[in-house]
């Protein structure tokens, strides 16, 4: 399997950022880590190996990015305004640097944003904010409402980074018609209800999506996200 490590200075974040790329061709997959996770966690938790046959055959090419969650949403020492601003800087880094690298290496127009747990929020928010850049959103065990991270504070910038809010008021849902959106959760997943609520918002706006609730005592952890990735990342 082709594996590449990249590190460079991000002007948007004013710090070095790292990522891992797996594969040589195929649908590009932008992988966001879990809460305060690192760029290597997808590999360390067996998700890359889980998809090895598709990566080796040129079906998928993974780009596993780092997070700055500890500087943004999880930074309780900062005012919520600055948490949101740091998140927006992170998004600009993804657009300016990561998407540019992806396009340089692979010109296929197919791009799936994916993530587990907190990474599911990142994937969904990025995909719905940038429908021109993605063709798929695959979330596993996701929670999508960020109000718990801002201590009752609210602003326009927060609104436009909180998918349940801006999608509930969406007046042009047609712009998402080309995106295959998958919400995967489990009957023992602590985020099951959050997926149901988010799916209701999408359904009410006519935004195409698929909600899958796995049985067999499936809950919020890697052993269940692995088969979900096998099922929905293609």
Protein language model annotation of sequence segments:
Residues 1-234:
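Non-catalytic cap/lid and distal C-terminal segments of serine-dependent acyl enzymes
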